């Protein structure tokens, strides 16, 4: 049964629940485990309240809510051209190399996992479009992706060692308005991070497992870095990585 073909509610289980949890990653957010529990219900409440502007959100995903999810995706599209790796050598999303290989001498945790994942994770993409929504509502200029996928070839060109941008992360910024200075960008990005912590349940830093993360302002003062590197490997399975809008919203 295709996503959207049946009503979803608390206690439901299955792949359609996983897809729902991913699409609502930026509305509070929960684990994409296929179990429609209280966390998923709160996601639906948040979407119905904040985007659909329902006076009495019910946490039940009927045809009306499915239609709103489609409208939301169309209103806040993801520009995959801005995400593709710029190395000129890979497909735009790495070469799926180094699975299970970690930086020498470092702990075997995702921060040091050298794998080039086969796309960008759905949770971070859906969280990005939700960030666009909340930031627009707060009066920000339109959010733009400034850094997406960066494979090892691109890393070597720029003398980088980070693995976050191999499918698990996006960097986002906002264009300066007329008369603004870079310090205004610092203030705006701080406010944006605050919105994402409040509305999308991001954590600042990587202290807790299975949480979406933001780089703190001392690392990313004039942009917002968001990633999913703190998740267990089962939540980073290949099926959660996509390379196009068609795959993201299928």
Question: PLM features: what roles do these ranges have?
Answer:
Residues 4, 68-84:
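Intrinsically disordered, low-complexity Ser/Thr-rich linker and spacer segments
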Residues 16, 29-35, 54, 126-129, ...:
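Catalytic phosphate/metal-binding cores of nucleic-acid and nucleotide-processing enzymes, i.e., regions
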Residues 32-33, 56-58, 139-149, 201-217:
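Surface-exposed patches in mature extracellular/periplasmic domains of secreted proteins
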Residues 161-170, 174-250:
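Catalytic cores and adjacent binding grooves of peptidoglycan-active enzymes
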Residues 7-72:
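Short acidic, glycine/serine/threonine-rich helix-capping segments at coil-helix boundaries
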Residues 135-137, 143-165:
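Active-site-adjacent substructure of cysteine-protease-like catalytic cores
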Residues 3-12, 29-34, 54-57, 109-123, ...:
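Second-shell loop/turn segments in exported
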Residues 79-140:
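Active-site acidic/histidine clusters and adjacent loop/turn architecture
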């Amino acid at each position: 049964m295709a996503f959207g073909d049946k009503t979803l509610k608390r206690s439901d289980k299955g792949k359609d629940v996983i897809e729902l949890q991913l699409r609502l990653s930026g509305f509070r957010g929960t684990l994409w485990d296929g179990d429609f529990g209280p966390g998923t219900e709160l996601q639906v409440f948040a979407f119905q309240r904040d985007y659909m502007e329902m006076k009495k959100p019910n946490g039940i995903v009927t045809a009306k809510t499915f239609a709103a999810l489609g409208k939301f995706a169309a209103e806040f599209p993801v520009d995959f051209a801005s995400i593709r790796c710029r190395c000129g050598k890979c497909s735009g999303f790495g070469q799926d190399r180094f699975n299970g290989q970690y930086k020498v001498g470092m702990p075997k945790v995702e921060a040091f996992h050298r794998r080039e994942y086969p796309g960008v994770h759905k949770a971070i993409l859906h969280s990005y479009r939700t960030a666009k929504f909340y930031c627009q509502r707060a009066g920000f200029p339109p959010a733009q992706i400034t850094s997406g996928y960066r494979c090892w070839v691109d890393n070597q060109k720029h003398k980088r060692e980070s693995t976050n941008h191999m499918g698990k992360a996006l960097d986002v910024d906002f264009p300066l308005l007329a008369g603004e200075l870079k310090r205004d960008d610092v203030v705006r990005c701080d406010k944006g991070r605050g919105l994402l912590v409040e509305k999308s349940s991001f954590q600042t830093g990587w202290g807790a497992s299975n949480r979406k993360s933001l780089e703190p302002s001392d690392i990313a003062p004039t942009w917002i870095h968001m990633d999913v590197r703190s998740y267990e490997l089962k939540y980073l399975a290949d099926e959660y990585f996509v390379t196009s809008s068609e795959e993201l919203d299928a």
